[in-house]
UniProtKB/Swiss-Prot annotation:
GO biological process annotation, one example: methylation
Protein name, per record: Homocysteine S-methyltransferase 1
Listed Pfam families: S-methyl_trans (PF02574)
Record note on quaternary structure: Monomer.
Record field: catalytic activity: S-methyl-L-methionine + L-homocysteine = 2 L-methionine + H(+)
GO MF annotations in UniProt: S-adenosylmethionine-homocysteine S-methyltransferase activity; S-methylmethionine-homocysteine S-methyltransferase activity; zinc ion binding
Domain Hcy-binding: 3-317
NCBIfam families: PRK09485.1 (NF007020)
Cofactor: Zn(2+)
SUPFAM superfamilies (alphabetical): Homocysteine S-methyltransferase
InterPro entries, alphabetized: Betaine-hCys_S-MeTrfase_BHMT, HCY_dom, HCY_dom_sf, Hcy_S-methyltransferase
E.C. no: 2.1.1.10
Protein residues bound to Zn(2+): 235, 302-303
Length: 323
């Protein structure tokens, strides 16, 4: 049994992934109005990155994801750093998550009745579109001159550095098109990565990837890879998730991970976020229970979800009365 299967079994059949990172960094006073997004805090306020990991562990997360989604070597170089400094920051993202997990686990073991699992650390790798920060991560349109080979070249060194930093998992997140999924599968084979990986897509309509390509075609690519342990979706509206899980169940035997956005909608007039309940939707944790029943093995949150969200999800999925 691999580390991921073992964790899911220890969690009672469904493990909890952490939630939104940027929102929580802002809540702690970080300014992330930066092309590097939450990865900017690796440079300026690493202690806050570790604090967010701690908050999610306390909330019951079984998997915490490094703050490297938008951390790329070209992105750091554009900030005036050397290649060596950029690679050090990538390693730091995993180091901070590992330190938080180890410290939290040590404190948990001192308690007479531990109610937590020893969490796994996933090294986050965002899409090429996330690096471009031009909206293409939401459309999947990278332009005619981008090929699978170019995408492999873009991701290769970051994957090598993050994999060498000691994570338990590699998490490719919010992948918006089939070409990038194919490139990542080939890259995992070429680099002989021995760490289990997951590849999660993003969707705006609940039926296809952001690019409009079908889940079925992309899952065929992932199904053929032994390096990909988990498939799923993240950064997607929560109301689509149950249907996506049902569709994935027909197309794959791999474990399924889902960690959608909160479902809040920005009210441009009032300049505030409207809570999900205003839209007539069920609360996030109530939906999470349905996702578990539909067949998801890992459940968490993405944009605008918080430790409170994950605490509620952990309680409802694991049947706990309190943390």
């Amino acid at each position: 049994m691999g580390v991921l299967e073992d964790l899911v079994a220890r969690a009672g059949g469904c493990a909890v992934i952490d939630g939104g990172f940027a929102t929580q960094l802002e809540a702690l006073g970080a300014d992330i109005n930066d092309p590097l997004w939450s990865a900017a805090c690796l440079i300026t306020r690493p202690h806050l990155v570790k604090e967010v990991h701690m908050q999610y562990l306390e909330a019951g997360a079984d998997v915490i994801i490094s703050s490297s989604y938008q951390a790329t070597i070209p992105g750091f170089i554009a900030r005036g750093m050397s290649v060596a400094e950029a690679e050090d920051l990538l390693r730091t993202s995993v180091k901070l998550a590992n330190e938080a997990r180890d410290e939290f686990w040590k404190s948990t073991l001192r308690k007479s009745k531990p109610i937590y699992n020893r969490a796994l650390v996933a090294a986050s790798i965002g899409s090429y579109g996330a690096y471009l920060a031009d909206g293409s991560e939401y459309s999947g349109s990278y332009g005619a001159d981008i090929t699978a080979e170019k995408l492999k070249d873009f991701h290769r060194r970051r994957l090598q550095v993050l994999a060498s930093a000691g994570p338990d998992l590699i998490a490719f997140e919010a992948i918006p098109n089939q070409m990038e999924a194919q490139a990542l599968v080939e890259l995992l084979e070429e680099e002989k990565v021995q760490i289990p990986s997951w590849i999660c897509f993003s969707s705006v309509d609940g039926k296809n990837l952001c690019s409009g390509e079908s889940f079925a075609d992309c899952l065929k690519i992932l199904n053929a890879s032994e390096k990909v342990a988990v498939v799923g979706v993240n950064c997607t509206p929560p109301q689509f998730i149950e249907g996506i899980i049902c569709e994935f169940r027909k197309q794959t035997k791999k474990a399924i991970a889902v960690y959608p956005n909160s479902g809040e909608v920005w009210d441009g007039r009032a300049k505030r976020w409207l809570p999900v309940e205003c839209l007539g939707h069920k609360s996030f944790d109530a939906l999470a229970k349905r996702w578990q029943e539909a067949g998801a093995s890992l459940i968490g949150g993405c944009c605008r979800t918080t430790p409170s969200t994950i605490r509620a999800v952990s309680k409802i999925l694991k049947g706990r009365t309190g943390h």
